[in-house]
């Protein structure tokens, strides 16, 4: 099967083909996904919760993501892999951001990196990375690295101010050079409007079924998570 590439994000959007993305953190699960029709794998900082057992993603380090990205690449050599940039790995300056992203690409084997964008100050990092020829996926809405600012993992876009902010971040992320945008935990109407407005594809998680694709945490689907989100269909009871 032909490997999904960064160019396919826009091609799928044009052809109205749904993009499929799922998380993986180790060699064995990556092998299973490698044999499936899933388009892309996300090595997410969600590993802090589903692998390391933390209450949030803030403790995940660049070395953690690098380690797991290497393992996933070994298990899925022909899959498109997106590596999360963990908290504080892209918040300091452009030089550090490029170095950290470059490590995930060159040493980890990732094809692209994902950044959570919750304010305009983060947009310059997208531009810096794309200028360095590193593909970027932006992440808006309920951005888990902002959990302490939100006061918990709460749905975003429930009032006019939040909706306008999310829509603005989506447009500016596209303008900065993002190849796609993950939209997490916002009302489906908000995600639908953004999807219809942008030229780049949207990938939803807990954002309804109107996005150009969906991403889910593998552990949720297998019933292995402590708390499975309502939007995640559970195919197995991995805890039994």
Would you name each region that the model predicts?
Residues 2-240:
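Alpha/beta enzyme core
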